[in-house]
From Swiss-Prot:
Keywords: Menaquinone biosynthesis, Methyltransferase, S-adenosyl-L-methionine, Transferase. This is Demethylmenaquinone methyltransferase. The keyword Metal-binding does not apply. It comes from Thermotoga maritima (strain ATCC 43589 / DSM 3109 / JCM 10099 / NBRC 100826 / MSB8). GO terms for molecular function: demethylmenaquinone methyltransferase activity; methyltransferase activity.
Length: 229
């Protein structure tokens, strides 16, 4: 992604910051909170002390983590300053940083665990982000990615979901937010995203031991990447 495209994406997320949580409700059939709670469970399995929440947005995962484990030191990073303004208001004792996931501003082996909820598909160079995650994770660290997945149109449920993404999401999201372009872009980002097998393979190639949990007819999925050294 060139500088121009990155700026365009940043502006887009700044524009929809106030309505971003609504977008997630629409895209996930209202199940995104339940899915985030599963991410938190998976992170807490490794008993972390320091957690990085990439593409933190309005800080939903960071808040859930802090609620479950108040002792955690949580850092949220996002390229959208408007999103982070909301996150900071909602979680006073978290650290939120404007930054680029492709060039993380942290020392090697800084975190016990990393989360990415609904942000991985928006990264321009996903391999580079995975390498950065591996760099800043401590030994035996864990990366958990929650992401919406493209419909499998060979299945009836996939055809319904495809129709939903192409028509209902841009219309309803645009109607509520007044920004039809942003919601059309976000629907397209799901439709054009990698398959679960492709994501699993990419994570393995970048040094993670990977497991995958499909969610709700594979509308979404959780990818768990563990460093085995």
């Amino acid at each position: 992604m060139g500088g121009k495209t990155k700026k365009h994406a940043m502006r887009l997320f700044d524009r929809i910051a106030e309505k971003y949580d609504l977008l997630n409700r629409i895209l996930s059939f209202g199940m995104d909170t339940k899915w985030r709670k599963r991410v938190v469970e998976l992170i807490l399995e490794v008993n972390p002390e320091k957690v990085l929440d990439l593409a933190t947005g309005t800080g939903d995962v960071a808040r859930l983590l802090k609620r479950k484990a108040p002792h955690l030191e949580i850092t949220g990073l996002d390229s959208s300053s408007k999103m982070l303004e909301i996150a900071e208001k909602r979680l006073k004792d978290g650290e939120f940083i404007v930054g680029d996931a492709h060039n993380l501003p942290f020392y090697d082996r800084s975190f016990d665990a990393i989360t990415v909820a609904f942000g991985f598909r928006n990264f321009s160079d996903r391999r580079r982000v995975l390498r950065e995650c591996r760099r800043v994770l401590k030994r035996k660290g864990r990366l958990v990615i929650l992401e919406l997945l493209p419909p499998n149109t060979k299945r009836f449920t996939g055809k319904i979901y495809s129709f939903y993404l192409k028509t209902w999401v841009p219309f309803v999201g645009g109607l509520f937010s007044g920004d039809f372009h942003a919601y059309r872009y976000l629907s397209t980002s799901v439709l054009n995203f990698l398959t679960p097998d492709q994501i699993v393979e990419m994570m393995k190639e970048e040094g993670f031991e990977v497991s995958f949990e499909p969610l709700f007819f594979s509308v979404a999925g959780i990818f768990i990447g563990d460093l085995i050294w």
